[in-house]
Amino acid sequence: MKLTCMMIVAVLFLTAWTVVTAEPHSSNVLENLYLKAHHEMENPEASKLNTRDDDCEPPGNFCGMIKIGPPCCSGWCFFACA
């Protein structure tokens, strides 16, 4: 019984915390994202998705150890970039 009461209090506290810390005017945030995406459709050069990091290694080049991330353009390294 005590455990059930503690769980109910914890859920109510977390729900209240979420409501209190929620970002105000979230509709403006979505509207700004829509406007930014619309601008990128009209001007593809403005899109950050089209940019490529030239510091990465092309496929086949030695990258070192097994890791996922930066040295290879694909993001996969198993002694040579995939």
From Swiss-Prot:
Signal sequence segment: 1-22
**GO molecular function: any one?**
ion channel inhibitor activity
Top-level division of the source organism's lineage? Eukaryota
Question: Where primarily located?
Answer: secreted
The UniProt similarity line reads: Belongs to the conotoxin O1 superfamily.
Relate the protein's function as given in its record: Omega-conotoxins act at presynaptic membranes, they bind and block voltage-gated calcium channels (Cav). Acts on high voltage-activated (HVA) calcium currents in molluscan neurons.
Q: What is known of its domains?
A: The presence of a 'disulfide through disulfide knot' structurally defines this protein as a knottin. The cysteine framework is VI/VII (C-C-CC-C-C).
Question: What is this protein's name?
Answer: Omega-conotoxin PnVIB
The organism named in the record is: Conus pennaceus (Feathered cone)
According to the entry, what is the taxonomic lineage of the organism?
Eukaryota, Metazoa, Spiralia, Lophotrochozoa, Mollusca
